Amino acid sequence: NLFGNNSYVYYYQSAFRPPDGWHLHGGAYEVVNVSTEFSNAGTTGCTAGAIYWSKNFSAASVAMTAPQNGMSWSTQEFCTAHCNFTDFVVFVTHCYKSGHGFCPLTGLIPQNYIRISAMKNSSLFYNLTVAVTKYPRFKSLQCVNNMTSVYLNGDLVFTSNETKDVSAAGVHFKAGGPITYKVMREVKALAYFVNGTAQDVILCDGSPTGLLACQYNTGNFSDGFYPFTNSSLVKEKFIVYRESSVNTTLELTNFTFSNVSNATPNTGGVQTIQLYQTITAQSGYYNLNFSFLSSFIYKASDYMYGSYHPRCKFRLETINNGLWFNSLSVSLGYGPIQGGCKQSVFENRATCCYAYSYNGPSLCKGVYRGELTKSFECGLLVFVTKTDGSRIQIRNEPLTLTQHNYNNITLDRCVEYNIYGRVGQGFITNVTNYAINYNYLADGGMAILDTSGAIDIFVVQGEYGLNYYKVNPCEDVNQQFVVSGGKLVGILTSRNETGSQPLENQFYIKIINGTRRSRR
C-alpha cells in the first residue's frame, strides 16, 4: 500500500509461482522516512515535457504519491515525475504544446497521451506513449533498485538488467498536492501464497513478529515457547581508559653552534665567504644553542656596516622563544663586518644576516666593486634562510601534549567496547548497587575476567566513588517467544528490562500489537 506512511510494498516477479504456503523471498520495501511537498512550480504553472525539480536520495526505493484521487495531466496540476538511477533517468510527462521552448525533452506529445521515457547522457533511449484512458490521473511513481524498476500507478512501466539504488527523484507540479515522498529500505519478507498469488506478507524487519516468522519460516504457530536468536546491529562504540589523562612529550632536536678556529677569510665578494656548521631543519621541534655568542659583540645595522635582518624580527639570542617557520637553514661564516651582511642578503645568500665582532684582524676583503682588494675587519656572520609557516618550531623545552580521556559508557544496548585495552561486543549494565569488594581484579585492579578471559565486571572511578559495570553477551541465549491463541504475546528473557515482570528466574515482556517495550 503506497498510501500508508508506515507501510510497505511487496513486489515479486510474475514468473514466481511457488506452491501454496509460506515462502521467504526478497522484494519487500519498508518505509523509513516520509516527507511532503505542496508545490514547486511558478505562478503561471509547471513546465511539461521537462525535468525541473529533483530531490537527492540514496535509497533502495523512493515512492512519490499524490492524494488518493490523483492529479490531472495538466500544467495547472501535474507536469513531470522522474527517477534518477545515477547513470540514467526515467520520467513520465505530458506536453501538448508546440513552438520554441516547449517540450524540451520530448517534443510534442499528442493530446490525451502521456510519455514514459528513459534518458542517458541527455539522449532518450526508451519511449513509450500511452493513452490517458489507461492512466486517467497521476497517482504514484515508485523507483525501485531491483532491476531499476519504475512503477506508474502501481504498474511496471520500465525495467532494465541493472540494479542500482535511487540517487534522486522528484515531481514537478503546480497544484493538486501534496506529493508525499516515501524513502524505503529493502527487507526480506515471508509471503503466504495461494494459487501463485501472495495473500499475506510478514516483513523480516527485526520486529518480534518478523523475528519469529522469518526464523521458523512460517507465519502459523501453535501455542508454546519458541527460542530465537537475534543478531544485533552494533552501531555504537566506546572506550574505557586506564588513565584520565595521558601526556605525550614530543621529540626536541638540539643543535649547538660553536666558534670555528682557523676560519679562512674571504678573498673578495660575498661568494668567497665560506660556510660552516650548516643546519637545515625538517618538520618538528628544534633548540638552537648560540651560547658561544656571549663572547662576541653584536653589531647593529648602520647603513653598509653590521647586521642586516629587516625580514627577521628577532635576535639569535631569542630565536628559541617559540618561533614558527615553514623552512629554516642556519650557517656560520667569517667575512667583513663592513658590507658582508647587507650584500649577502642582496645576493640571496641568506634571508637575514647577523654580524658579530670579536676584534678580529683586518684580513677580510671588501664585497663591493672597487673594494674587493681592500682589507676590512673580519667578523662572525650568521646566515639565516627561512620562510614563515607552521612546520618547524624553535623552542627552549620539549613540547608536552596532554590528552584528557573521558569515559562515556553506553548502557543497555549492544555496543563495541575497548575496556582497558580488551576489545569485544557486549550489553553493559550498571551493577554498582549490587557489587561487592572482590579480592582479585585483573588489569591493575580494574576488571574481573570470566573463564574465557573476556571481561565480566569492570570498575571505573566516578565523581562520587567507584562504579561497577557488568558485560553481558549481546544476545540472550535463553530468550523465547511466547505464543498463545495463535498470536505472539510476549518474550521470556533472563534480562530485567523496562516493563518486564519477574517470572521465577526469568522476566516476561508483554508484546502489544507486535511490538515490545524498549530497554532501559
Swiss-Prot record:
Pfam families: CoV_S1_C. It comes from the Viruses. InterPro entries: CoV_S1_C (IPR043607). Specific enzymatic cleavages in vivo yield mature proteins. The precursor is processed into S1 and S2 by host cell furin or furin-like protease to yield the mature S1 and S2 proteins. The cleavage site between S1 and S2 requires the optimal sequence [KR]-X-[KR]-R. Cleavage is not necessary for virus-cell fusion. Residues 1-520 are extracellular. GO terms for cellular component: host cell endoplasmic reticulum-Golgi intermediate compartment membrane; membrane; viral envelope; virion membrane. Glycans are attached at residues 5, 33, 56, 84, 121, 127, 146, 161, 195, 220, 230, 247, 254, 259, 289, 408, 430, 496, 513. Transmembrane segments: none annotated. GO terms for biological process: endocytosis involved in viral entry into host cell; fusion of virus membrane with host endosome membrane; virion attachment to host cell. Keywords: Cleavage on pair of basic residues, Fusion of virus membrane with host endosomal membrane, Fusion of virus membrane with host membrane, Glycoprotein, Host membrane, Host-virus interaction, Membrane, Viral attachment to host cell, Viral envelope protein, Viral penetration into host cytoplasm, Virion, Virulence, Virus endocytosis by host, Virus entry into host cell. S1 attaches the virion to the cell membrane by interacting with cell receptors, initiating the infection. Homotrimer; each monomer consists of a S1 and a S2 subunit. The resulting peplomers protrude from the virus surface as spikes. Belongs to the coronaviruses spike protein family. This is Spike glycoprotein. The gene is S.
